[in-house]
Amino acid sequence: MSGAAPAPQDDEPRIGPNAILQTIGVLDRHLGRAERDRVMRLAGVPVPPPDSGMLPESQCRAVHQALRVDQGEAAEGLLWLSGLATGDYILANRIPGFAKAIIRVLPGFLGARLLAAAITKHAWTFVGSGRFRVESFRPLTFRIDDNPLRADAAERPSCFWHAAVFERLFGTLVWPEVTVEEISCASVSGGPCLFVLHPKGKKTAMPSSVHSG
């Protein structure tokens, strides 16, 4: 099953365009234009223009799922790189310079709380119809219920795109050695997706075929 997107409805929840645009960029760089076009055809989603606004949630989900179907385990690394690139875009274009400066000079636990609050405020842009909240501050843990970008099914936690976005943001602004570990995933258990941030890092199984972002 390709998971091709249904026709979007006017009232459909939407997700920021980087969920697709940065994935397209990663595919172009690592697999080439022909493979990218194949994934998009499999998803049943047109290539959005670079200046796209918020995109239908179903299209974002379809592209991520089509990539998983087409690339198998290699999709993990590609979605990770897309998440890192999305984090870079947010840092460059969505967080004001003064806010970044304040977060950087604060003690880690305070900077983390400030950044977590900003992420919570704008969570609708990356969870669509899902629900986001800070589950815990010790350790800092994010929770997404009904994550629209989850895999249809998986044997282990597989929300690499979200984990990479969080890791890039907190690694750049708060904890340089941070790693993000998804300890529970809707794709596996049907429950919430839980992401734990380890400020000093933790050895975890990296996504397949991850190269430098």
Curated annotation (Swiss-Prot):
Protein's UniProt keywords contain Metal-binding: no
Keyword set, alphabetical order: Bacteriochlorophyll biosynthesis, Chlorophyll biosynthesis, Photosynthesis
GO annotation (BP), single: light-independent bacteriochlorophyll biosynthetic process
Domain of life: Bacteria
InterPro entries per UniProt: BchJ, NO_sig/Golgi_transp_ligand-bd, V4R
Pathway assignment: Porphyrin-containing compound metabolism; bacteriochlorophyll biosynthesis (light-independent)
Pfam family, one: V4R
Entry-linked NCBIfam families: BchJ
Entry protein name: Bacteriochlorophyll synthase 23 kDa chain
Originating organism: Rhodobacter capsulatus (strain ATCC BAA-309 / NBRC 16581 / SB1003)
